[in-house]
Amino acid sequence: MLGRDVPGRPVLGRELKRRNLLLGAAATAATGGALAGVAAFSTSRAPATALQKDLLSRDPKASKAARSVYRLLAGLEADARAGRRRGTLVGQHAEVHNERYNPEYGDHTGPKPPGYYYRKPQDITGKLPAFLELDLGPGYQQESWGVGEARDYSRAAWPARREFWTYTNDVVDLAMGVWHGLPRKDDGSYNPTGTETLWNGTKTVLPANGGAPAGLVGMSFHQPWPGSPVKSYEQTLRRSAPSAKDPGWIDRVLTPGSAEHAALLLDLSFLADHLGYLAAYDVPVLLRPYHEMNSIGGEQSFWWAGLKPQQYTALWELLYHYLVGSRGLHNLIFVWAPTAWDGIHGREPWDFYPGGEYVDVVGVDDYSGTPDNPFDPAAWTSTWHRGLEDYGKPRILAESFHVPLGAAQRTTLDKAPWVLWTVWGDGLTAKNADADVQQTYDDPKTITGGRESGPAGVQWLALHDGTFE
């Protein structure tokens, strides 16, 4: 989820993201106990399955690079399940639209370059994250989708030279930079140097990472409701969508031939055009759409969190078949990530699982507690890690305000050996002491990014040619 994107207004914490839900031990007490809160939302679960080892079982045309990335994740998962944990990739989400346009966002007032929170771990620790997640949504209060400078992949469909859409160009340039390096030699791609002068005379400077492959790339999609006249965070919420008053709206969205369905496909085409550019340069993307579908935040949940399970899985399948089938995108690794099912933020998510044929990685967005006051005092985040085991997929902590290791939690990843742990945006500085960030990045089993990826690290270049084992 995202922070508010109102120009000139602060985005604080995950006030940053979730403003309506209680956090921590006080909320647990209000429900009469953590486990009781979970049990109140019991749903059905599929039987345990063996660990998926290769993308070909889901997509026979998966790119070699995407298969290599998946083998890395599956290998880390297999080792963890066997009791010989090799390491955890440390990730960072960057809210590029807020970095670029909201002067109150982040750890100081004033403008920030795109990718500010990609570089911030390096400013603190000397090391880059191994994974950068980005987002083409939700827009910054603009009418219709758009882009900054016109490019081959966007000029035919999307209005160009829109100042408050320039961040979408930054998003793909950052993704290219993490996978291929920044700055890099001219390879026919856009902005290989990381420095670009725009039509309005302003200059964009992206963070350098050594000029060589430096990590993995992900994409979430905070999609405003299909057909929304304004693209903004507010329009991603259930209270703003037609479904708040019209229970039949979502069925029309899912029905080919309807105006609502056409609006959905328009949104997905915006996503696909940008992902297609990355596919053309062989950039694998961990795509995490329609997350936190099990939220119990009511009207302040995302519009897709108000759906019945069968509607949600139909929406997921529609997106999948459009991106992979209609658009031929075989660089994608699909991530399904409910919110923590603590009975406060979310209910048990099992009925919302689209199925192994549509999902490669499972994860959780965990805002259920803090390192000082965890949901499960015995082992922070372990409840969610155990709950996802039977899907037979690599398990990731997809969103957290907090780094996994620090003064309050020194053994998190031994007890819950996630293969990837991603910190959300400015939560890195708002919710973590520098010493805790340093401890996480310095841990011998933390996999970081850049040319040097730590003792448990990865040779990023080996992922590119499909030879990684």
What residue spans do the PLM features occupy?
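C-terminal region of N-terminal signal peptides and the immediate post-cleavage residues
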Residues: 34-50
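N-terminal module-boundary/linker segments of secreted carbohydrate-active enzymes
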Residues: 46-133, 137, 147-155
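N-terminal secretory signal peptides
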Residues: 1-16, 25-34
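Aromatic-lined carbohydrate-recognition surfaces of secreted/lumenal glycan-active proteins
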Residues: 288, 324-346, 394-403
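Substrate-binding cleft of secreted/luminal carbohydrate-active enzymes
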Residues: 394-469
